[in-house]
Amino acid sequence: MSDTVFCRKYQKELDALPFPPLPGAKGQEIQQTVSKQAWDEWQALQTRLINEKHLSLLDPDARAYLMEQMERFLDNRETDQAEGYVPPSQ
């Protein structure tokens, strides 16, 4: 695997993920098209969504919802946001 990847979110070459973040073909696709930066940002949003919306990863509907939100995020489309979330001040 190369050290960089053309990131579908940022439309430029950025550091690659060191390994597929999901099992199977979807994980391979993400590793080949999503940068580490974009994936880290998605994981932060995913964590906020899970916490604020009280999602259970045992629930197939919650997992499907998160996969949909992931695709939207990585494609630069509007995603749901955690209600009441205030980004930390710099």
Curated annotation (Swiss-Prot):
InterPro entries: Fe_traffick_prot_YggX, Fe_traffick_prot_YggX_sf
Keywords: Iron
Keyword Iron carried by entry: yes
Gene Ontology molecular-function annotations: iron ion binding
Family membership: Belongs to the Fe(2+)-trafficking protein family.
HAMAP family, per database record: Fe_traffic_YggX
Role according to the record: Could be a mediator in iron transactions between iron acquisition and iron-requiring processes, such as synthesis and/or repair of Fe-S clusters in biosynthetic enzymes.
Protein name, per record: Probable Fe(2+)-trafficking protein
Lineage: Bacteria, Pseudomonadati, Pseudomonadota, Gammaproteobacteria, Oceanospirillales
